[in-house]
Amino acid sequence: MNSSQGLPETQEKRAKWFKSHGGVNAVVEAGLLSNTVSLGLTEVLVLGLIRQGITKFLMILGHGSTEFGETLRVYESAGLVKGFQFRNEVEMAHAATALRWVYDEPCAVITSIGPGALQAMAASIVSSSNGIGVYHIYGDETTHGEGYNMQQVPKREQGIFGQITATMGSSYTLHTPQAFRDALRRGATRVFHPSKAGPFFLNLPINTQPAKVTLRLD
């Protein structure tokens, strides 16, 4: 068991444990997560998004979002989230905007690194211009600077994709895994703002996605 009361060691068992106890919010409200735990960044983000009421993920996965996709697979198998596969990022982003706009269901768009993210970003203009809050979560180049990661922006500068998303609207790059709290706070402020909502772009470098984070889940 992990150091928190009753929290299993593996991701699969943790997801089932959350489900058997009524879900993530029920576990937190019952005070069962009072101690520190060490989890991968993508799992922490999924749990944080669930806490914000986001359980629907519209996705086109690739090498830039493999780790995030695997975490979603595990939590979907446990019945805690629902994933929807698409073939076109523009269509996917429009569907997410409509889901929030028409049915008031918060959701997240997930893409890989590069061209797909650019297409989703182009379609985000609809949610931005109409004040519709949607998470846009994109895979991003590693923070190691080891050379081009396939399909990243081909320019010899640091954090190019983060510059693009920052130009488009509210944006955050999780260069440091421990910054997840700030990222989720800023995301919630943008996505759930009562009068100035819009898309929130969260860039996830390939190497930080599996990185361990020590935290209290309550």
Describe each model-derived feature in a short phrase.
Residues N2-D218:
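N-terminal alpha/beta PP-like core and its mobile active-site loop of ThDP/TPP-dependent enzymes
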